[in-house]
Amino acid sequence: MIRSSKERLLWAQFDALQLGSGWDEEDIEKPQILVEDVFGDSHPGSVHLNQVSEQVAYGIYEKGGKPGHFHVTDICDGCAQGHDGMNLILASREVICDMVEMHAGYVPWDGMVLSSSCDKSIPAHLKAMARVNIPAVFVPGGSMRPGPNQTTSLVAGDISLRQKRKDAITPAEIRNYKRTGCPSVGACTFMGTASTMQCMAEALGLALPGSALVPATMSELQFFARRAGRTIMELVRRNIRPIDILTPQAFRNAIIVHSAIGGSTNGLIHLPAIAKELGMELDPELFNEINPKIPHIGNINPSGKHLTESFWFAGGI
């Protein structure tokens, strides 16, 4: 008997409350899957995630499950630059992780699918998956499309500010950077923390192969989301949990990938935090041990030339 059905036998009010939320009697007999994202108007990496979760739900329905939707909006490192908002950014990782734990624990879900795109929400979700330890799949929210001349939000922010201080840029040029720096939804299109952590989710085995850094406006993102919905039902059936996937070798593999793609140094903060949720110690010296042995083959901005969607088109992780 699945976990949710066992608990339902103990407390009739549980069924009554779900029926009052729009579920029917057939729904409450099915495997119940938490579908949680960080959808909101906070930044381009999250504004489309409700559509991703809808596709996840379709996949769950296809395989005989019942999804339940929850949202905890994240905040953006870029929006927090240059003022006291930056003091809140790392703390938001813990808040999001804690909220997922609460949502996943207050009813006996049989599995969960989490979706996010960016710097602190992805490690928050990966930490939560490890902490809650029920069958789980992560769906990365994909990459933003590049602007004209490969413009990125990094150009619009950091580079234009430096040029302005040197009086080497006109107001019209700054305006152009602003208007072309973020031309679509998705994570910023360079190998910052957001793109790095999408890659780490896939390298760890918590996201489907090929799903990190999908161009966020392409239908492929919807296909991966629907496939994740189907996959979680198989994981529930086989009771495969994050603790079965997040082995010491999985973390070592992630560090190897991190080195090869020139990943953000924030990986040194987030990967050990994920491991700690499982009682593992991920010594920072392991990064020092692995990095000199792994060639930097990912020619990806800012340590290389190309933007993240080019990396995905070339084969990705």
What spans do the regions from the language model cover?
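N-terminal amphipathic/basic leader segments beginning at the initiator methionine
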Residues: 1-30
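Flexible, glycine/charged-enriched surface loops at secondary-structure junctions
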Residues: 1-4, 27-28, 64-72, 171-177, ...
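Conserved structured core elements
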Residues: 11, 29, 46, 50, ...
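Buried hydrophobic positions in well-ordered alpha/beta secondary-structure cores of metabolic enzymes
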Residues: 33-35, 119, 200, 265, ...
